[in-house]
């Protein structure tokens, strides 16, 4: 399974580092993987990395448990074992919003499997799927100035040596499909930066059916499902700056600059221990144009029906020691478009950002509104807590207001903290061992084409048929296409003669339309799209 110069790894949560795993998977102190459907190690899909040449020999010869710093890693991969699946239909017993699990069975190399595990005339035991969207050490993406800057037209493209697949870097875009394809194929060229040996591996751009296989496994008891009827949606990467591995605070979160959580960042829910801490009285600054109304301590925003406006309510306070700020907030508004959010800044630096809440699910009358409590533990310093109710350019819903009450600031308060997944919610397993950026981030080109139509992909002729899936109809059952259309409300538009190339996953700002089951079409031209790479061996 491991090719030459690939290193098995696991994540040490205590120290927030990746370490070399025991390749035999017998050492429980340095475990590598588990594809069990339950138990302590559920969701621990096998991860492996390549490293730069500087310390490659050291890490290859190192003992299990050796730290492998992210600075030395240039690519990260996740193993997708060979499996067969019952083709899903009718939301698999669930609903559009909550489809059921896909029935997946792991099989041996000589047993029947879905077609993603057939590569040319070879039956695969599995394949390595890139853990994150494709990035680059030096190339950036700026529309109009860096289009097709990979410059890859053959399998010996020098720019491919700068490919990186890791978290917290900006995805590479603005390249057409052929550029991404030849960059992926060039990762195994002689003298490559990753240590790949071309006689052992085939590096290529993800085909549509390979994406589909990952989507199937995600929507199974080995991925995001805890039973045949209970599954959770992969959270969106909502970073509008295209940072890899980021996550929103809900599956369909609206975009923020860098996302809410990094890939390994936990969410901490705190509860104040009653009777601890001393009260700090914050200074309240109301909006001068659309002031909030104070009704017995309940503040409501003042820009109802005022389109393209924002009404703010600001609390300023100073903590002389570690402390907390807590509050209750709610909203009754047009779903997705009119939202209440909050932001906490320390000395003008944002330390807590949110995507906001919207809709009418919390209530349609003020007396019956359901509120959500938030508690944030803060270090010593001066802070501003700003609530913002923002209106889009048209349409109202519910009461068309945001609500805030019970704002409390305490110096020296004690809290009971509960650690929950944060960034991990954006992976295919809900753990750090899954695959990221498959919902949001950037749309991703895959090698799936309608009727072998080259269009604006950049190919002079298509590569060997083992590198792409060809479709000749307006629908297809399999590959997570027609059979999973609109699951979780993910967008779905099939390829055609005008836009013959598939892309998957969705953008940072697609909200509910983004997801592992999203499909859409394009001419294959350079655009704000990235790609995903695969290793078979």
Give the predicted meaning of each segment.
Residues 209-212, 236-265, 330, 386, ...:
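C-terminal, surface-exposed recognition/capping segments
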Residues 297-319, 337-340, 368-375, 404:
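Short beta-strands within extracellular/lumenal beta-sheet-rich domains
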Residues 336-348:
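Short, surface-exposed beta-strand/strand-loop-strand elements in extracellular ectodomains
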Residues 387-398:
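Short beta-strand-plus-loop segments that form exposed binding edges in beta-rich domains
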Residues 67-75, 105-264, 412-438, 537:
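Short aromatic-cysteine micro-motif
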Residues 349-381:
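Extracellular carbohydrate recognition and processing domains
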Residues 264-300:
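Extracellular glycan-recognition surfaces and repeat-rich motifs
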Residues 318-328, 381-384:
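Extended extracellular/luminal ectodomain segments enriched in beta-structured repeat modules
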């Amino acid at each position: 399974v491991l090719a030459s110069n690939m290193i098995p790894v696991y994540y040490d949560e205590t120290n927030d580092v990746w370490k070399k795993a025991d390749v035999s998977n017998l050492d429980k102190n340095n475990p590598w993987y588990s594809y069990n459907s339950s138990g302590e190690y559920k969701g621990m899909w096998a991860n492996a990395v390549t490293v730069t040449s500087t310390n490659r020999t050291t890490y290859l010869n190192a003992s299990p448990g050796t730290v492998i710093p992210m600075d030395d890693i240039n690519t990260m991969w996740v193993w997708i074992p060979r499996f067969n699946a019952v083709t899903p239909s009718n939301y698999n017993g669930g609903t559009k919003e909550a489809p059921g699990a896909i029935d997946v069975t792991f099989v041996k190399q000589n047993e029947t499997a879905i077609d993603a595990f057939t590569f040319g005339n070879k039956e695969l035991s599995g394949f390595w799927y890139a853990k994150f969207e494709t990035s680059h050490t030096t190339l950036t993406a700026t529309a109009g100035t860096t289009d097709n800057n990979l410059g890859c037209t053959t399998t010996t493209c020098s720019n491919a040596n700068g490919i990186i697949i890791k978290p917290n870097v900006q995805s590479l875009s603005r390249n057409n499909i052929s550029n991404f394809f030849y960059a992926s194929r060039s990762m195994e060229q002689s003298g490559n930066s990753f240590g790949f040996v071309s006689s052992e591996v085939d590096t290529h751009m993800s085909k549509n059916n390979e994406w589909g296989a990952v989507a199937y496994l995600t929507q199974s008891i080995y991925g995001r499902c805890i039973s045949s009827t209970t599954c959770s949606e992969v959270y969106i990467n909502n970073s509008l700056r295209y940072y890899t591995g980021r996550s929103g605070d809900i599956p369909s979160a609206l975009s923020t600059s860098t996302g809410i959580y990094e890939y390994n960042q936990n969410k901490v829910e705190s509860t104040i221990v009653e009777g601890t801490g001393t009260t700090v009285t914050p200074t309240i600054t109301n909006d001068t144009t659309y002031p909030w109304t104070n009704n017995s301590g309940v503040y409501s925003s003042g820009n109802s029906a005022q389109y393209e406006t924002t009404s703010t309510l600001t609390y300023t306070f100073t903590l002389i020691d570690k402390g907390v700020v807590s509050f209750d907030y709610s909203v009754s508004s047009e779903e997705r478009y009119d939202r209440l959010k909050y932001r906490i800044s320390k000395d003008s630096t944002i330390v807590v950002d949110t995507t906001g809440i919207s809709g009418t699910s919390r209530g349609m009358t003020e007396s019956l509104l359901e509120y959500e409590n938030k508690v944030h533990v803060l270090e010593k310093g001066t802070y501003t807590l700003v609530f913002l109710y923002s209106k889009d350019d048209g349409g109202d819903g519910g009461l068309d207001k945001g609500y805030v009450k019970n704002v409390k600031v305490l110096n020296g308060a004690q809290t009971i903290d509960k650690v929950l997944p944060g960034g991990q919610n954006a992976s295919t397993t809900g753990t750090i061992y899954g695959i990221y950026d498959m919902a949001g981030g950037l749309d991703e080109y895959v090698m799936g084409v309608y009727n072998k139509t080259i269009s604006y992909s950049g190919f002079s002729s298509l590569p060997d048929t083992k590198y792409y899936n060809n479709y000749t109809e307006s629908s297809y059952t399999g590959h997570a296409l027609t059979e999973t259309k609109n699951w979780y409300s993910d967008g779905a538009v099939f390829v055609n003669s005008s836009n013959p190339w598939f892309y998957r996953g969705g953008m940072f700002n697609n909200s509910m339309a983004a997801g592992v089951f999203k499909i859409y079409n394009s001419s294959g031209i350079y655009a704000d799209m990235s790609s995903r790479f695969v290793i078979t061996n």
